[in-house]
């Protein structure tokens, strides 16, 4: 039985969405159990033989400063959910709450793995090859050093290797061009570190990639800082939404376009399902001594269910131990990079 701790109060919609998703998830996973963390009155209407309520009196708001979430709201649903992972009561925690708060609380309670300075958010985005590209970081770390990007590359490679049972997934460094001479000094230095890691056998480093390569599936892992990654993510979601709305408008234009829509319906449905960002919701916070998954704050029930699915798959595939093993193998390289650059910012 795989147990997940769910922050039922987090996100833009709270229990209205999270509880609906939890029911759908339990109905499709007979070997899963959920710890529903939140204010008991808000969760009172939910009953399932494989779900139990863990009370938490406080809620971390989407605009709460990190200091408030970490130091003042010590009985928040987010913190209590992560505490379940620390105490061994749950294999993973899932939250749609405040990203900064989730990262800070997770890092405070669970700590980072040896050789890792900062955890990274690592979602999987659909690509043209019918698979997914893992991109990290997508919002947790806005300002990154070259050494942080090396750590992200090792963690992302370990994640894809664990989920896909693949020995050496390809890794690309997001840049403004493929040439080694392009990019900021941080990116150039990161390229040097990644090439060294590739030569040492710790990575299958492809080289520099551009934004369109994420969706081409040029590499299985793309490494970038959180600012660039988050912009790329939100831009892709905006484009997908724009195309979907434009198609709906065009097919409603007249009787002939409506007839065409009927004929094309199966193809359009398959296409929309393939690019629907809700079905790719749920990103691992890599680099921690426990499994934590971040859902979009605006997630609906379908999207949050997929975040639960990702956490379940990670726990079932023993993701944490497999990532830890890969990072341990690369630890001398990571420590050497850290020592060359001096102490990293927290």
From Swiss-Prot:
It is an enzyme of class 2 (transferase). It is found in: Cytoplasm. It catalyses: a fatty acyl-[ACP] + phosphate = an acyl phosphate + holo-[ACP]. It comes from the Bacteria. One of its GO terms (cellular component) is cytoplasm. Its main location: cytoplasm. Its EC number is 2.3.1.274. GO terms for biological process: fatty acid biosynthetic process; phospholipid biosynthetic process. Catalyzes the reversible formation of acyl-phosphate (acyl-PO(4)) from acyl-[acyl-carrier-protein] (acyl-ACP). This enzyme utilizes acyl-ACP as fatty acyl donor, but not acyl-CoA. Homodimer. Probably interacts with PlsY. Belongs to the PlsX family. This is Phosphate acyltransferase. The gene is plsX.
